[in-house]
Amino acid sequence: MERYGGAGEDESRSDPSHEWSAQGTETGIEASMWRLGLRGGGGGGETFPERPDEPDCIYYLRTGVCGYGSRCRFNHPRNRAPVLGGLRTEAGEFPERMGQPVCQHFMRTGTCKFGASCKYHHPRQGGGGDSVTPVSLNYMGFPLRPGEKECSYFMRTGQCKFGSTCRYHHPVPPGVQAPSQQQQQQLSAGPTMYPSLQSQTVPSSQQYGVVLARPQLLPGSYVQSPYGYGQMVLPPGMVPYSGWNPYQASVSAMPSPGTQPSMGTSSVYGITPLSPSAPAYQSGPSSTGVSNKEQTFPQRPEQPECQYFMRTGDCKFGTSCRFHHPMEAASPEASTLSHIGLPLRPGAVPCTHFAQHGICKFGPACKFDHSLGSSSLSYSPSPSSLTDMPVAPYPSSLGTLAPSSSSDQCTELISSSSIEPITTTTGGSETVAAGVSSMTSDVSHPEPAETNKGDSASNEAKTSS
């Protein structure tokens, strides 16, 4: 197998180890120098072959030496100055090699990971030239190439591992509004912890107020502080309600600080308490939820419909989903929630999972009815129905004795060979229970024991006679 040299050269196919052993005047050091191309005091120009039809040896052009010597299959020009002149050593520039194929990666992305060691041609008017207009980026930092194919990975996940060097198009998902320049500066600088709010009507004795606010991009819920220090902001979902259910319902934001009442006219948490007769939570169709879905889920009429979105009205992929999300499916019909947080839809089909298990994994987004009558687990005995049930502390075969706390209780057991009832008197009241067997009569009367003694005496008299 020919590994290094070209065909027709005997010295390229011969093993140099035989030549080293044949020359008795050379030592091991000289052989090592010969292999490194340092033989003859550094005159490596005669050692390295010139092959005009082959590509230039990149290592030789950079360092001036070649470890393969005469066995190298690439070209080693004697004068490296013209070739090195084509190598641009400035930062961010790449070599120009006239006659070599054009670096396709450089033409697409404007960069080359091999740098000056790349063996292909990098024209100045190509991707890295100054004459080419730089590629514009979207607000996420990915390139916008309108004439190219869309990046499939970016359309699914919203990310791209190639970054600004990706050759495909990265459009902004429809329905998503890019943040303004001012908002981007706020996000890059970090959110303000204590932004200025409107002045509030607070007594003069309470001059030191604690105001905790969210960034301007994230709306919060303004509630009264329980300690009388003004208003503070709680995230959505933390506003207390008189009632609990395992399904998280959407909590709309409360009015702005300027519309809040004064401290003396509101409750502790700024929410009017519900009366005992009022339901725990009143829900209704919210316009903010539909508008959020319109901005969150993309509409792609040319793509198939998202089946999960059609069933539940939600999509876990969000803006990165590649399927179509029609808005008529995102606006559910007006429905009320039960006391456990599930929708009540009288005209719809009952939810089979709720009817069997009493729960629903879809929660308020379920399209079926969750009436309490459709569930097989709706029976709940009241505590009053369990007070009159008799409790037997002993097995039924030994009789049932009514419990009593009086000290004048008198219990009489009337037994015989057959089963007879037992009468128990407790404070003038009698209860009839099951009788006991003849085994109880043996314990109650000692007469059979005396009879046994008489029989044994007669037996001894007969034996002595």
UniProtKB/Swiss-Prot annotation:
Composition bias, Polar residues: 283-298, 454-465
Subcellular location: Nucleus
C3H1-type zinc finger span: 51-79, 97-125, 145-173, 300-328, 345-373
Superkingdom of origin: Eukaryota
Region (Disordered): 1-26, 173-200, 274-302, 397-465
Extent of Basic and acidic residues compositional bias: 444-453
GO cellular component: nucleus
Keyword Cytoplasm: no
Protein name as it appears in the record: Zinc finger CCCH domain-containing protein 58
Species this chain originates from: Arabidopsis thaliana
Highest classification ranks of the organism: Eukaryota, Viridiplantae, Streptophyta, Embryophyta, Tracheophyta
